């Protein structure tokens, strides 16, 4: 039996990110919080330079990190610095917080595929950084759109969106 693995992704308001990611095959659990910044014990009211992020626990026998990243790049715009939809500021930046060298390699390779694909109109600005502390958000932010299905989101699945791999990928 393979142990569950973890991913930490930031792509704008964590409500919409969590709601879509939690439904993906192989995802065991998600929680929203703050990561990639400078404040200990971050909260919604005081999270300094942290991004709103989603911690994902997944079964590597049912999905893989690359598949999660491809979905991540489908549901948010990785070309807008510090912005998703109407949300602006460093809290809403696009970021991948990797937990090991293999996650870093896969993240950089996936970004290169996104760049080469032309699926997004600009240059990818997604930050790729080592994972630091993940500060879990307050209970009212956890699974927000499950409790309030008509609540705010700027994330959506783009029908027909498929990320091709570059011919040189993995070489």
Curated annotation (Swiss-Prot):
Keywords: Oxidoreductase. GO terms for biological process: protein modification process. Its EC number is 1.8.4.11. It catalyses: L-methionyl-[protein] + [thioredoxin]-disulfide + H2O = L-methionyl-(S)-S-oxide-[protein] + [thioredoxin]-dithiol; [thioredoxin]-disulfide + L-methionine + H2O = L-methionine (S)-S-oxide + [thioredoxin]-dithiol. Belongs to the MsrA Met sulfoxide reductase family. It holds the Pfam family PMSR. GO terms for molecular function: L-methionine:thioredoxin-disulfide S-oxidoreductase activity; peptide-methionine (S)-S-oxide reductase activity. The active site is at 13. It is an enzyme of class 1 (oxidoreductase). It comes from Mycobacterium ulcerans (strain Agy99). The gene is msrA. This is Peptide methionine sulfoxide reductase MsrA. The lineage of its organism: Bacteria, Bacillati, Actinomycetota, Actinomycetes, Mycobacteriales. Has an important function as a repair enzyme for proteins that have been inactivated by oxidation. Catalyzes the reversible oxidation-reduction of methionine sulfoxide in proteins to methionine.
């Amino acid at each position: 039996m393979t142990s569950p693995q973890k991913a930490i992704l930031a792509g704008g308001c964590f409500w919409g990110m969590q709601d879509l990611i939690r439904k993906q095959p192989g995802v065991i659990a998600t929680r929203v919080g703050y990561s990639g910044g400078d404040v200990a014990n971050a909260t919604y009211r005081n999270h300094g330079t942290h991004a709103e992020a989603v911690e994902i626990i997944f079964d590597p026998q049912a999905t893989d990190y690359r598949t999660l990243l491809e979905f991540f790049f489908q549901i948010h715009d990785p070309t807008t610095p510090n912005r998703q939809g109407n949300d602006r500021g460093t809290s809403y930046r696009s970021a991948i917080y990797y937990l090991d060298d293999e996650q870093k390699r896969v993240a950089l390779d996936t970004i290169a595929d996104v760049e080469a694909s032309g699926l997004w109109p600009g240059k990818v600005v997604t930050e790729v950084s080592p994972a630091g502390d993940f500060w879990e958000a307050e209970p009212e932010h956890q699974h927000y759109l499950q409790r309030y299905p008509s609540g705010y989101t700027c994330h959506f699945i783009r029908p027909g969106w498929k990320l091709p791999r570059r011919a040189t990928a993995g070489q």
